[in-house]
């Protein structure tokens, strides 16, 4: 199943913790996965959803 990335709607500020971002994406936003990705000008928490 293909996953599409979307910036987290609940994360604010710079993303410095992959696990925290992943847990927040999964628990709060019902995503499949999440990680800190560099999006200019800083690292953001990106959630991955089924397309």
Curated annotation (Swiss-Prot):
InterPro entries, per database record: Defensin_plant (IPR008176), Scorpion_toxin-like (IPR003614), Scorpion_toxin-like_sf (IPR036574)
Disulphide-bonded residues: 4-51, 15-36, 21-45, 25-47
GO biological process: defense response to fungus; killing of cells of another organism
SMART domains: Knot1 (SM00505)
Alphabetical UniProt keywords: Antimicrobial, Disulfide bond, Fungicide, Plant defense, Pyrrolidone carboxylic acid
Top-level division of the source organism's lineage: Eukaryota
Family (UniProt): Belongs to the DEFL family.
Subunit (UniProt): Forms oligomers in its native state.
Role summary: Possesses antifungal activity sensitive to inorganic cations.
Name of the protein in its database record: Defensin-like protein 1
Organism: Sinapis alba
């Amino acid at each position: 199943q293909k996953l599409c990335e979307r910036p987290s709607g609940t994360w604010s500020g710079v993303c410095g913790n992959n696990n925290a971002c992943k847990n927040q994406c999964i628990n709060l936003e019902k995503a499949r996965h999440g990680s800190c990705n560099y999006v200019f000008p800083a690292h953001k928490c990106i959630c991955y959803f089924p397309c």
